């Protein structure tokens, strides 16, 4: 047994449960599932008592019946209540929870304050409970936004420019929350270790109606909510691989004090995603649009659509993510983005979450 990782030869855990914040979220529930599969006891937080059944139902959809191996507790990022009890006796914390509004917030502080202050609440509770290491889920948005270059590949050495133009409230919230986390551990951590994962767009199997914005892209393509595809590009990673990356960062001594970009390949245009759906899914994706919408039309439509307005500065922009560090240091081996796209679509269809194509899928 490694004294540094606390893992036995079989990969099983030693000591108390692992705390996962935000267990009802898309990435959070996949982290819970991966930990359970590895033999860990898991404690996860939800915002309200009613969300416990949501977590367990999603795990049942994934084929898991954790029973007593999973403890669900109530703790909200906007309140101190519940966090000390949540972190008690835990050796590790995966802080996955983060506010993400369904619509553009009226003021950026609606996102920034709970993201930053919530992260600090979790870290204080972890420190006070004697947690060995916290793995923070940050974002590619804390690395690659606010820069002047129209085409650039980013690494963990980069940070988003908070003084740059067109910086969204979400990008600010993730950048400020991550910087606050590093500052806290350096100044007040009292031995608490920190590792950070910076995922790109998250795709992969969904277990219920709570999922990432990237999943919504696939859903809207299948539903033909858009008459064509905007000139936007994204990097993607499969949620299962990102859960695996969190576990690797949790126990590997080399992950201490490090950031890791989580991306499975280079940037893909939305048109590329549409073609993957058409080529790999057959009839359910036969009507997925592939014609590009002119930038001028997107700009015109954005005057009446706040969500669309947020994408206008990114038209034609290519942000690459170099994930060599996760591969080289942690031995991470993500699946190709095309597999993540197909798994996303198949799960949406299977759960009846695609309006126009669900009846065609068997």
Spans of features found by a protein language model:
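Mid/C-terminal beta-alpha module of Rossmann-like enzyme folds, strongest
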Residues: 245-310, 328, 337-362
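NAD(P)H-binding glycine-rich loop region in Rossmannoid oxidoreductase-like domains
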Residues: 49-50, 60-117
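N-terminal Rossmann NAD(P)H-binding glycine-rich loop of SDR-like oxidoreductase domains
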Residues: 16-40, 45
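A conserved pocket-lining segment of Rossmann-fold NAD(P)-dependent short-chain dehydrogenase/reductase
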Residues: 104-105, 161-167, 202, 209, ...
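Conserved Rossmann-fold NAD(P)-dependent oxidoreductase catalytic core, especially the SDR/UDP-sugar
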Residues: 95, 99, 103-170
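Active-site Tyr-X1-5-Lys
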Residues: 165-194
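Glycine/proline-rich active-site loop of Rossmann-fold NAD(P)-dependent oxidoreductases
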Residues: 188-192, 204-217, 249-260, 284
């Amino acid at each position: 047994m490694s004294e540094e990782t606390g893992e036995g030869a079989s990969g099983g855990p030693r000591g108390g449960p692992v705390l996962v914040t935000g267990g009802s979220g898309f990435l959070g529930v996949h982290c819970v599932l991966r930990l359970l599969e590895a033999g860990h006891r898991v404690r996860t937080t939800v915002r309200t008592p009613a969300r416990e059944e949501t977590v367990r139902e999603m795990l049942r959809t994934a084929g898991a019946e954790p029973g007593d191996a999973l403890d669900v507790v109530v703790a909200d990022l906007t309140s101190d209540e519940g966090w000390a009890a949540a972190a008690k006796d835990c050796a590790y914390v995966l802080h996955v929870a983060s506010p993400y509004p369904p619509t553009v917030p009226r003021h950026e502080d609606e996102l920034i304050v709970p993201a930053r202050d919530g992260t600090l609440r979790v870290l204080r509770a972890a420190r006070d409970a004697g947690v060995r290491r916290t793995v923070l889920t940050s974002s590619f948005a804390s690395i690659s936004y606010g820069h002047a270059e129209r085409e650039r590949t980013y690494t963990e050495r980069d940070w988003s420019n908070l003084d740059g133009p067109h910086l969204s409230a979400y990008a600010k919230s993730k950048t400020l929350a991550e910087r606050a986390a590093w500052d806290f551990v350096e100044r007040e951590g009292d031995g608490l270790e920190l590792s950070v994962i910076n995922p790109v767009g998250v795709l992969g199997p969904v277990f219920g109606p709570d999922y990432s914005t990237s999943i919504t892209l696939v859903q809207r393509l299948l539903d033909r909510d858009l008459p064509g595809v905007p000139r936007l590009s994204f990097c993607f990673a499969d949620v299962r691989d990102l859960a695996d990356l969190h576990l690797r960062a949790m126990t590997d001594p080399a992950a201490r004090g490090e950031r890791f970009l989580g991306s499975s390949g280079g940037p893909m245009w939305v048109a590329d995603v549409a073609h993957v759906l058409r080529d790999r899914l057959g009839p359910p994706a036969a009507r997925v649009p592939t014609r590009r919408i002119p930038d001028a039309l997107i700009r015109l439509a954005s005057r009446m659509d706040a969500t669309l307005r947020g994408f206008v500065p990114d038209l034609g922009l290519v942000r690459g993510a170099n994930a060599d560090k996760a591969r080289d240091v942690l031995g991470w081996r993500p699946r190709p983005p095309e597999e993540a796209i197909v798994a996303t679509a198949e799960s949406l269809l299977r759960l009846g979450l695609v309006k126009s194509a669900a009846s065609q899928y068997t």
